[in-house]
Amino acid sequence: MIVKAWPGKINIGGLTFYFTTGPGPVTLPSARGYPSALPVHIADADTFWKAYGVYLTFAKEIVDAGGFGFGDVTPQGNGTYVFVGTITLPSFPADKMKDFYTPLFRSLSEIGVDIPNPRHAFLPYAQGGNGVTPISFPGSAADRLFISRLLPCALWDNNGTRLDAVAAVNRATAELGYRVTTRAYGPSAAVAGYPGNTTAAVNPAMRDMVIHCVTFKQEPVDVLPPAVFAAEHARLRARIDELVRLTPDSGTYFNEADALEPDWQRSFWGAHYPRLLRIKREVDPWELFWAHKTVGSEGWEVVAADGLPTQNGPLCRVERAVRFLWSP
């Protein structure tokens, strides 16, 4: 573990750990400034996914402590998977760090996953390489197909039954070859402060989230023929729709979402959308300002010959814009 000191301001603790399963050789995702013990190999795949569920359960503790958690599963073929977890804790007392993370590793040990010697160290906050992103992702996210969902606090109620269902969905998704990433953080209205949750445009679902779950197709898709892309998108969309069914009142983080997100007004903006649409119409009655799936964009679309989603092409009027759904 690293506790990164920001003199006179905050300390940021960072803990990284790995566990793997499967018969294949393992390539560990690269870390940035986070020392860790050697990865623990888990012989039984079911135990690997139980350990994943243990991390998901603990993620709320990270959020409640004001921290930020990464918990990513990367398939590496032939039934081989790597999990990497990282916890960062701003403004957390250095002498309390071990007390905080010990329950996580105790719970893992109880199911037979013993992480050797989790420990922490101190590094200057500004030291080169001390980023908080623990994993590099080859290539650009721009050429990857990915879809996301915000996982709300309610999933951690009722003894975690619904959270177990989320873990099962993510397992099935990873077993199809998708990379499943989670980002645990809590941008609640209380944490954010002014302007709060009434006049801001932030999706209300983000104020109630514990995890932002993003699922990637690992191979680039920007070179795929349109029909193949459509099939790949439908396949991944079907997986994420399982999470949507488990979180019907939640939504999606606009900046890391499906370019073809269905019901995007509600997914991206939630109950704020009617108010935001009124503002857009007041300040831009000419519809001069436009971007894909942003507030008030229903009346226009970029049309490409191959039918693929793009923002490079002619901007055309939508013949039958579904405006009535959100009219004040």
Task: Put a short name on every predicted segment.
Residues M1-P328:
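Soluble FAD-dependent oxygen oxidases
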